[in-house]
Amino acid sequence: MYQIFPTPRHFTVTDELVPAGLPVVCLEPALLDACRAAGYDPQANLAEFLTLPGFGLSVTANLMDGVSGAFEMEIRQDGVHISCTDGAGLYYAVEAIRQLAVQTPGGYLPICTVQDAPALEVRGIMLDIGRDKIPQMQTLYTLIDLFGRMRINHLQLYMEGFCFDYPQYRYLFSDETPLTAEEFRSLSAYARARFIDLVPNQNVLGHMEKWLERPQFRHLAECEDGYIFNNL
């Protein structure tokens, strides 16, 4: 039995299969412009998993009315036909195709129809990268891929301590591995191509223990010498 995650609003599938080779993608011009603006390449996205030699798969997509991220898709013998509200809807349709391809042996796709639309406009997740657990860039890229396939469209990176590389203060965290501004820009572009808004979440003094421990900033602490609890 085929499954698509998140579960779409409507999904009907048959026992018939269609060969799924390297895709030939044709987009409505306005939809193509939207994908280019986001840095999303549906042709390359499909080519990651549609690789059956000798069978080109026609994929056509056009715009329809509706909420952001909505799509309607038919997989037929003559190819894949997608209607979507925007680039995000096309991306979600393509990722649904990925899931169907993984579940179908031999490089085929099932003949089916899928219709879906987000129930929530903002579908967010917050990832804590503070307190001595800053991920490597490849880990963050992998997580962004996963979040995109889950149709997360808002990602906050929670930062506490020395998570961000402030050039003027590098002498304070020479032994740390903070993310640089350039790395954040790369992550933002990578997320945008998966229709995710990347939102850095920088805490202020209430959660800046590592900064306030330094003599240069101790005067900003509410209690410069720390707290002592008696009679506990």
In which residue ranges do the predicted regions lie?
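Acidic, contiguous N-terminal accessory segments
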Residues: 1-118
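Substrate-binding cleft of carbohydrate-active enzyme catalytic domains
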Residues: 120-232
